């Protein structure tokens, strides 16, 4: 573990969102699995030291809006959503104000959302704490340190948990850190 305080880790800074509105089938199915796992945290991650684990889940849908330049791609994504039973609803941009009267629909070709508690967010630090506690109970050992180099790796599958620092360790792996920006907007309840 590079930093056991997690001061510079990405996860405590994230919003802990889980959703299923993706383009690829695999991501949609991962989103569905995540939701089911999150609902089962109290049972799955219970430990002797943490008998009541939680991630403070807030089930709330995501509204994704698309202009004309991205509408066709989203219509194709909706076919995957339907095939995966993702529960995604589509709204024509011209009808957006019927569902969300406080949103300016100008320039919006289509929008998608869920209202079946299949998406939302969690407290990522609580979730991490519950996962770590369960891992320790099952024998995992967390060691403070930092991998500086690797001599040779012979494996069918390799999982790098270095996140945005992967490139520093594995130069041939095409992972580039990206900065994400989140805006919080307070809207009236509908």
Model features per residue range: what roles?
Residues 12, 77-78, 170-172:
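Short amphipathic alpha-helical segments
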Residues 60-62, 109, 178-182:
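Short hydrophobic/aromatic beta-strand or adjacent loop that forms the aromatic wall/cage
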